């Protein structure tokens, strides 16, 4: 069935239909791209909130080829799970910087990358990978207290701000972690699908 923007929006209006745990439905990323860009066409900055927000008319960059994804894996020394590869095939980061809103502090807005794009943001991605690697032992202990076991072979690849995709070899799906530092980290999405619905569409499975 062909999906247009209206039908895709209807798909997401019903929490019963769209929130099905971690199951990745066919064409999910294509439908997600349509819905998220539709949302951003009417986006406004919420000045009372802290943190990164998407600008009006933000769009996803075109996806990567298999060769570019392989190069990305090589640059970050990771083997990407199937769902992360499918995500990158459909979209490669966002085109506009995200706005870092400072709430009611009186500080001016700042700007930074939205969803990271390869190779545009490779240097920043590598810096963030190095940052979490330096505190890996403490990070593993922090996550263990949260009930999540980070395996030794799992790589952490940032996807947006301080959100990291867990890239373990030979896996279909990947959890997403929010890591401020090695002592402040949580599981932010049980899967990439769960994370994207929460981060971009403000949907939570209740």
Whereabouts are the PLM-identified features?
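Glycine-rich, aromatic-bearing surface loops/beta-hairpins
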Residues: 172-206
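A surface-exposed partner-binding patch
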Residues: 1-151, 155-157, 161
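Substrate-binding/catalytic groove segments of enzymes
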Residues: 148-150, 165-171, 184-188
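Short, flexible beta-strand-to-coil junctions
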Residues: 91, 160-169, 180-182
């Amino acid at each position: 069935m062909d999906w247009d923007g209206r039908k895709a929006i209807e798909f997401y209006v019903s929490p019963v239909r769209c929130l099905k745990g971690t199951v990745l439905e066919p064409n999910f990323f294509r439908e997600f791209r349509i819905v998220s860009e539709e949302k951003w066409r009417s986006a406004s900055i919420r000045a009372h909130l802290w943190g990164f927000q998407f600008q009006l008319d933000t769009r996803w960059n075109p996806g990567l080829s298999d060769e570019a994804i392989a190069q990305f894996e090589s640059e970050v020394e990771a083997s990407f799970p199937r769902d992360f590869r499918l995500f990158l095939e459909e979209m490669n980061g966002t085109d506009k910087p995200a706005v870092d809103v400072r709430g009611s502090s009186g500080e001016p807005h700042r700007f930074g990358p939205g969803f990271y794009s390869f190779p545009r943001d490779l240097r920043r991605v590598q810096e963030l990978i190095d940052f979490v690697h330096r505190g890996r032992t403490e990070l593993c202990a922090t996550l263990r207290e949260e009930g999540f076991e980070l395996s030794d072979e799992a790589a952490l690849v940032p996807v947006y701000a301080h959100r990291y995709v867990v890239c373990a070899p030979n896996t279909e799906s990947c959890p997403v972690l929010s890591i401020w530092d090695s002592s402040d980290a949580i599981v932010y999405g049980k899967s990439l699908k769960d994370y994207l619905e929460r981060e971009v569409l403000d949907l939570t499975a209740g």
